[in-house]
Each structure stands twice: as C-alpha cells, then as structure tokens.
Amino acid sequence: MFCVQCEQTIRTPAGNGCSYAQGMCGKTAETSDLQDLLIAALQGLSAWAVKAREYGIINHDVDNFAPRAFFSTLTNVNFDSPRIVGYARDAIAMREALKAQCLSVDANAHCDNPMADLQLVSDDLGELQRQAAEFTPNKDKAAIGENILGLRLLCLYGLKGAAAYMEHAHVLGQYDNDIYAQYHKIMAWLGTWPADMNALLECAMEIGQMNFKVMSILDAGETTKYGHPTPTQVNVKATEGKCILISGHDLKDLYNLLEQTEGTGVNVYTHGEMLPAHGYPELRKFKHLVGNYGSGWQNQQVEFARFPGPIVMTSNCIIDPTVGSYDDRIWTRSIVGWPGVSHLEGDDFGPVIAQAQQMAGFPYSEIPHLITVGFGRQTLLGAADTLIDLVSREKLRHIFLVGGCDGARGERNYFTDFVTSVPDDCLILTLACGKYRFNKLEFGDIEGLPRLVDAGQCNDAYSAIILAVTLAEKLGCGVNDLPLSLVLSWFEQKAIVILLTLLSLGVKNIVTGPTAPGFFTPDLLAILNEKFGLRSVTTVEEDMKQLLSA
C-alpha cells in the first residue's frame, strides 16, 4: 500500500504516505492496492478512447463510466474491494469493445500505452492485490526522484478531483465531448509514467483549465434544474418527527428523495456539502426539507450515531459506520461503498423511507437556530455594484475568501481563529465544508450586506471566480489587484483540482493549510511559491497583517 492523496496521510522523517495495513482514512491496504489496479485499467481504457477518437468513434458510455469509476478512488468514497474490482473488470471490457471497434475500421489499429492491454490475473482478491503492486504510484521513486513523483501525483489527484465534478455534472445531464477528449488524453498520458518536469507542470495547469469548464457545466446543470440559489435561512436544530439525513453533493438524489418522501410524514435533513441545497428554489419548495444537521464530515461517527433515522451517502465523505453502530441504517448511493452496508442501485429510496417510518425520529422540536445560505452566482453578481460602492466609500476594506475542506487535524482551528479575527469592515466569502468551522457564528453586516456570505459547495468556487472576474472588469484592473485574498483549507482531491483551477487562471498569492500536501516536496513548494506566490498558513496575526497590507 502507498497512498498520499489526502491531508491526513501519515508523515514521518522517512517519508510521507500511508503504507501499512490500513490508511488513516480507514481504507485497507487491499482496497488501496486494488484502487491502484483500477486506475491502471482506467488509463488503458482512456488510451483506447483517445485512439477511437482518431477514427471518429465516440462512445458516450465509456465517457460516462471512466470519470465515475475514477471518482470511486477519491478519499472517503468507496472502501468496498469487490466493487472496486468490478469497476476494473468493466473498464477492461469497455476497452476491449473500443479496441474491436477500432480494428473494424483499421485492421492495424494499435495503442502503445503500457496500460492498453492490462488484464486481471485472477478472480481472487489476494492475487489481484499482488498484481496491483506493479502499479503502486511510487514504484519507480528511486529512479525518478521525489519531485517528479510529486508532480505526477499532483496531476493524478487533480484529474481525480475533476473526474468527480464531471460525474456530478453528468448526473444532471451536462457533458461536453471536448472535456471528455481532454480527460482521456491526460489520463492516458499519466499511464505512461511521464518523467518530464515541465510537461507535468503544464499538465497540471491543463487540468486546472479543464476543470474550470467542468465547473461551468456543473453550475449550468444545477441552476437549470433547480433554479439559481438565493439567500435562504436554514434551521440547524431538530424538528419533531421521523427523519432521513442525506449527505454528499448529489442534488438530484436529494430531489428524488424529497419527491418520494412528500406526504409520508418523514422530514429530510441535509448534512455536510448538501447544506447549500436549501438555497435552490426547486429544492426548498419542499416543506419537509426542514433543516441541516451536524457539522463537518469528520464528526459523523458521533453525530450520525445520535441521528434518529436512516442516513444516505450520495458521494464523499463516508467513514467507518461501525464505530458509532449505525451501519444498519446508513445507505450508500452511486460510487459510494462501505463493506456490509446497504447500497441503493437505482433512484428508488423506498427502503430508506420504510426504515425511517419504523424509527422514532426526533421526539420534540428544538429552539430554532437559523443560518443563511444561498449566495449563488446570480446573487453574487447582483451584489457586484454594491461591493464596488462600499469599497469606493471606504466602508468595505477587504474581501477574504475562506473556504475549502474540513478535517480532524487540530491545526484547522486556524480557520476559525482567522475569520473571527477579520476586521469589521471586511467581508468573508465562504464555500465548501470548511465553513462548518464558523458558519454558526454571528458576523453582523456592512450597511445591510452580511459579512459572512456562503457561496455554496466546493464546486461553487466557480461562482467566486466569476464574481472576482466581474469585479476586476468593472474596476478596470486584474483579479490579483482586487482587495481580495484567498485562504483555502484542503483535505482531498477536489480541493487539489480547485487549487489547480485558480492557479491556471492566474490567481496568485493564495494561502493554504493546515499543512502542505504530503506529495509536495520542498522543491515543488518553492516552484509554486515562485510562480504563483502560493504559500502555507503561518499564524493568524502574521497572515492577517500581510494580507490586509497587500
């Protein structure tokens, strides 16, 4: 086992990465190794997808499957080894079908990619795990060095984050053949184990640029189906009655669940990254969407254990449900998996609803505590002139975008301390689950404009980017000249690709934390600092002073 893709990876003087029987996320060595094997199979599939396009062959089933299966290897998504192997078998079967199509057009068609002819050696998981050793990401570290390995992983993990957003967009009926072509090209190239530093840096920027397009179509999918988010108050306390909790990012799953629970007497609560759903008109119209429950994903083993109803996980993040003994009432959807828990294959939430009706639910309603969400792209753009006016009248000094992932590391208290130290004449824009560190606190307003503005899920970084570009255009300056600072917390691969997106768009002087990715060497950090001004958090006092004076 070797896995260094998330922020909580093991870090030692001898090197970084989880390499024992179990990773810090709870992923076993078996599952981790089989995910490496799956990635190799997907690289072979992408290699033939690239070749097929040379013959004018575009298979939408392949384009849909490939990023979805890749998404299953993202942190805290799928811990179920047999399902990972199933994805690998499907990838190989699709690859062979594509290969046959190419050969039907050109009898001499061939693919030079080293993953293009990969076959699984056995049905036995142990044998497959041994085969997977051929594809462990650091197998040639001694030959290529830590810097090249780190750049490879930056590209692989960044592309994995983009693949997750591609799947979210596809679920909503949004896809772009050019994006799929670019995805396959990059995935296939990574399967050649590239070792050119400049080429890898260029690839990382290409992934970032591609992901900007992915976030654009995902935004279009969400707003077309569910309307543009508008500021909405959400209760974060319990309401009497039977209940279901839904977590993850998939708004379509939430919509289907709301439709199927309407009139049943079962209330629905959002959790984690599903919180922004309350801002969408077509979702909040359901009166039994009563509130948001819990805090950051890392607290779920305590909070889920206390929730008096079933729980549905639609995407990341799931962690071991046996710890809180709620594994008999947690349900996984789509690419999510945990051994031994119930998995919903389709869109029918009937079994979940039936379980909710058999459970007690909340015995009484708590005193409401309301927070505000729903500052989507249209709302943000509508406020652009107000922001400019406040800046011109010196009522608004600075905007801080403080967002990203949450996690268990104690150093993440930095982000709470940072936002509570932001001066009263500054605005805080936030997104993703890192906001749970401070989104229940009171920040007041600046002439009626809330000082804490929740822009949505991690992918809604797109809205923040569009706002920044709009402000820069209106002020006749560059984005980096705005009174705007980005302070980002990261945990997994979606955060990595959003960082690449920002860097590829030329955004500079981003501050990140709580620690640097484990695959970043000192040399790579120095390169990113020199090219982009990217740096790690220090102390709240020093960072605040530096950012306000920039």
Swiss-Prot record:
| Stated role | Catalyzes the reduction of hydroxylamine to form NH(3) and H(2)O.
User: What InterPro entries does this protein's entry cite?
Assistant: HCP/CODH (IPR004137), Hydroxylam_reduct (IPR010048), Prismane-like_a/b-sand (IPR016099), Prismane-like_sf (IPR011254), Prismane_a-bundle (IPR016100)
Question: Member of which family?
Answer: Belongs to the HCP family.
Q: What is this protein called?
A: Hydroxylamine reductase
Keyword vocabulary terms for this entry: 2Fe-2S, Cytoplasm, Iron, Iron-sulfur, Metal-binding, Oxidoreductase
**EC numbers for this chain:** 1.7.99.1
> Which SUPFAM superfamilies does the record match to this protein?
Prismane protein-like
Cite the binding residues for hybrid [4Fe-2O-2S] cluster.
249, 273, 317, 405, 433, 458, 492, 494
State the organism's lineage. Answer: Bacteria, Pseudomonadati, Pseudomonadota, Gammaproteobacteria, Enterobacterales
Cofactor requirement: [2Fe-2S] cluster; hybrid [4Fe-2O-2S] cluster
- CDD domains reported for this sequence: HCP
Q: Which GO terms describe its cellular component?
A: cytoplasm
